[in-house]
């Protein structure tokens, strides 16, 4: 998909397959180098601790994601909201990746008044695993953002 990926500043030292994730190809080393964020220092500061941000073609930001495993859903939503409030309106997905059993908590928190404008999507661990296995088994190419959307549930409740 040719995404460049920001990994939270505090997570870049995590080792995967005997290599720090911050050393993999396609990892953004400094948010200040991303064209979209160059003029928005406050947004850059707000994004430093966000778990994952995808960038594409220097002009797009397909997703801002928080992986909730040990921290609460609210903290991830707060980080994304803080970022959104410091960046001009821009089309992107705000995604919470969390265990399947946390779905109700994600829905409940994402629908609180302070988070509603994120229009959060929920990406359960089981869907991440299913997508990963499918990509590995079939060696999928040409995956689109719309295809990924099939694995992410919109959680904003209308009314």
Where are these predicted regions, by residue range?
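Domain-level recognition of nuclease-like catalytic cores that cleave nucleotide substrates
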Residues: 100-159
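Conserved beta-strand termini and adjacent loop/short-helix elements that scaffold enzyme active sites
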Residues: 8-10, 15, 97, 123-128
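Solvent-exposed, non-transmembrane amphipathic alpha-helical segments
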Residues: 18, 25, 32, 84-85, ...
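Amphipathic alpha-helical segments
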Residues: 1-2
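Catalytic cores of nucleic-acid endonucleases
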Residues: 35-50, 60-124
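Active-site metal-binding core of divalent-cation-utilizing nuclease and nuclease-like domains
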Residues: 5-59
